[in-house]
């Protein structure tokens, strides 16, 4: 009977060790939980970026204002009859 109790105690100790420190134990669970949380943050940032891009695509497809804005800022274009004034601050760098 005494050897059986010792065997059960050793088995309990081994099971506790594998639960806390073994493969797929609590330490692995905590690490995976942290990894999942970080990946969810990254995914949310990418979702937000995608939504902005889809909105910009829709705006470019449907409206001419976005096209005009891009032409003005990226290509320096102006409409006929418009005058473009560029004001440069003396204190600005670059």
UniProtKB/Swiss-Prot annotation:
Recorded superkingdom: Bacteria
UniProt membrane topology term: Single-pass type II membrane protein
Cellular component GO terms, alphabetical: cell division site; cell septum; plasma membrane
Coiled-coil regions listed in the entry: 33-71
Database matches in InterPro entries: Cell_div_FtsB, FtsL/DivIC
Compartments, record wording: Cell inner membrane
Family: Belongs to the FtsB family.
Function in brief: Essential cell division protein. May link together the upstream cell division proteins, which are predominantly cytoplasmic, with the downstream cell division proteins, which are predominantly periplasmic.
Protein name: Cell division protein FtsB
